[in-house]
Amino acid sequence: YVNKYSNLIVCRTFSKAYGLAGCRVGFLAANKDLAQRLYNLRPMYEINSLGVMIVNEILKKNTFIIKNLKEQLRGKKYLLKELKKLKLQYLDGHANFIHINLGEKKSKLEKIFYKNNILIRGGLNISGYKNFLRISLGPENMMKRVVKILKSFLK
């Protein structure tokens, strides 16, 4: 698509799917002319040498990346299926997390997750979404832990 549209820039990060959040490494794709103009605007200090070394190693191990992404997708599929069974409203998307509406039980459940070493985020600070929890997706075995706690709590 980037060669088809002269004004399209696709930006990606290695942070989530590759497990490199601390490296702050990303990349972009654009047609040659646009990429050159963007290259001229780059900051003085781009990526550090450690980030370069880590990304090079990760890219060499493409099978690991694909396996990890497939495991995450299986975990997501499992979690969404279980949330439907529990009749919990959720916001799905293409990110590595979902938001689950827990109503007034949100605060209590946050504490229970914390006690069980499952770290989650409070959710959306937007009117109408205050009772949503943000849960990061992971492999199915991790999502089973989340579902077990949800089921136990909602009994």
What role is predicted for each listed range?
Residues 29, 99-103, 136-138:
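Short hydrophobic/aromatic beta-strand micro-patches
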Residues 7-84, 88-91:
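PLP-dependent aminotransferase class I/II
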Residues 38, 109, 146-149:
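Hydrophobic side chains in well-ordered alpha-helices
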Residues 22, 94, 127-131:
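Short acidic/glycine-enriched loop/turn segments that link adjacent beta-strands
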Residues 1-5:
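Short, conserved loop/helix-junction motifs that constitute active-site signature segments
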Residues 121:
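Active-site catalytic microenvironments in core metabolic enzymes, especially phosphate/sugar-handling
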Residues 115-116, 125-155:
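PLP-dependent enzyme catalytic core of the Aspartate aminotransferase-like
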Residues 72-73, 77, 82-116:
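Conserved PLP-binding catalytic core of the aspartate aminotransferase-like
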